[in-house]
Amino acid sequence: MCHNDLVEGNFLFTKNNIFLIDYEYAGLNDYYFDIASFISENNLDYQETVTFLKAYFTDEECDFKKLDVFLRFCDLLWYTWASLLYEKRGEEVYNEILITKYNSLKNPRSIAY
């Protein structure tokens, strides 16, 4: 089961816990999608990505080739989503997202540690 929308606004932080909300896109998926989506949607830089991956993959090794494919897929997915919504609604937030994702697609990140 994957959340499929791990954006900053879907995390609630309390003094002792972190909660995920907004499960409208949740469903069966490869967990690498959630990992890649978290990196992509939160625009993690290289060091933040390395820190996140080291914390996540404590019992197994990260498949970097698979992660790279999912990172590109997430950028393409959210670029397409933002393009459609910007065209339909004309809200600047969607234009900002599509520009960010376009730049990520144009200059893909390489993850290795």
What are the roles of these predicted feature ranges?
Residues 32-62, 73-89:
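Active-site activation/catalytic loop segments of kinase-like enzymes and analogous catalytic loops
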Residues 1-33:
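Active-site acidic catalytic loop and adjacent metal/ATP-binding pocket
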